[in-house]
Amino acid sequence: MTATAEKTAGRVVRITGPVVDVEFPRGSVPELFNALHAEISYKDLSKTLTLEVAQHLGDNLVRTISMQPTDGLVRGVEVTDTGTSISVPVGDGVKGHVFNALGDCLDEPGYGKDFEHWSIHRKPPAFADLEPRTEMLETGLKVVDLLTPYVRGGKIALFGGAGVGKTVLIQEMINRIARNFGGTSVFAGVGERTREGNDLWVELADANVLKDTALVFGQMDEPPGTRMRVALSALTMAEFFRDEQGQDVLLFIDNIFRFTQAGSEVSTLLGRMPSAVGYQPTLADEMGELQERITSTRGKSITSMQAVYVPADDYTDPAPATTFAHLDATTELSRAVFSKGIFPAVDPLASSSTILDPAVVGDEHYRVAQEVIRILQRYKDLQDIIAILGIDELAEEDKQLVQRARRIERFLSQNMMAAEQFTGQPGSTVPLKETIEAFDKLTKGDFDHLPEQAFFLIGGLDDLAKKAESLGAKL
């Protein structure tokens, strides 16, 4: 407990949108990140406003960021220093409920007030306590398991521009992994649509997974302070399950870009000089503070899946570029693949994984994956020639390769559980062994006699046989 932990009162002296300057008595200035409370009474409105100390301005003044709209707040209002930072409830009781960034329960107001609370500002685990993981997390999605295998206890990101399927794929992973995981899941909705949060709540309840999932939301209608802190609030809940209960935890974050965007808004409001492309000068530091806490320690882990919006499909933008350095696997969603009607719209040549290595996944898996990548890369290299001269001008070997590449592209598509209500087709799950076997046969030419359409939006070999038969061909 610090010297400023005793509750002291100050006064609001300046309000600029979500930025509030507060003056405290000499010697009682609150520390950075302390939470302050201000009581607002305006007409029929009565509420407690939470402010977080962001800067010390000198002369007993602090600059704070409000976590709620400042409507009704006026100069002279008394502000109380709580002596601690923002904290959220932790423990088994948070499962099955929705919280905001401040730890207030949204589906059952007042719930969780008497729970143990942890500060959202925490240090990452010590380096000596970290435990590298190389175990593969099987998803049942062919394109992911074959070409960008996910690491259990690792950090995984889904990159993509607007409208290419990031949120759908995140929901698909929740359906596939959380159902079979058996552990605890935490979902952070950072600056995304409220409708999507409601849809997720309903889907989790229908799938009987809600009882093992905690949800924390700070959606796009919230002030930037809330959107900047909600990921830390969700992560704190996940850390409790990892550190105190020794559980393997799944952490879903949608969307990391909104976390960066909120930080940029706050930085501008605080008057900091902008850095590249207008982002905050502290971008790398803020991203590191979040990502370094998402890690595996001895015998327990947090496996995170993060959606990352790519502004204007520009992967050199500082927001997605800063995220890359922290990841174990990247799945890049492509507008070009999306335009072909191939879902999930994963770009197999741009996606990567640190465990696509024969020492981890085995020689057979690695060999088949590399052959698939080789064929797709050669097909990409031939695109310009095909566009100018036509496919008939290619050598026979290249013609055959192009036909196989087109079959591979379509076979990488798959019906998803999260899209069942829209497509009317049940989602399919393909075991890794079957995926490797099927693509091995495909790259060797065993399926050259089948029409391309037979490979489109199906699961494994059984689905391929049925689809081929319906098109008048035999496997």
Swiss-Prot record:
Localisation: Cell membrane
Catalytic activity of the protein: ATP + H2O + 4 H(+)(in) = ADP + phosphate + 5 H(+)(out)
Membrane topology label: Peripheral membrane protein
Chain residues that bind ATP: 160-167
The keyword Cell membrane is assigned to this record: yes
Family matches, as InterPro entries: AAA+_ATPase (IPR003593), ATP-synt_VA_C (IPR055190), ATP_synth_F1_bsu (IPR005722), ATPase_a/bsu_AS (IPR020003), ATPase_alpha/beta_chains (IPR050053), ATPase_F1/V1/A1_a/bsu_N (IPR004100), ATPase_F1/V1/A1_a/bsu_N_sf (IPR036121), ATPase_F1/V1/A1_a/bsu_nucl-bd (IPR000194)
Family designation: Belongs to the ATPase alpha/beta chains family.
Subunit structure and binding partners: F-type ATPases have 2 components, CF(1) - the catalytic core - and CF(0) - the membrane proton channel. CF(1) has five subunits: alpha(3), beta(3), gamma(1), delta(1), epsilon(1). CF(0) has three main subunits: a(1), b(2) and c(9-12). The alpha and beta chains form an alternating ring which encloses part of the gamma chain. CF(1) is attached to CF(0) by a central stalk formed by the gamma and epsilon chains, while a peripheral stalk is formed by the delta and b chains.
NCBIfam families on file: atpD (TIGR01039)
Protein name: ATP synthase subunit beta
Organism field: Mycolicibacterium vanbaalenii (strain DSM 7251 / JCM 13017 / BCRC 16820 / KCTC 9966 / NRRL B-24157 / PYR-1)
Primary gene name: atpD
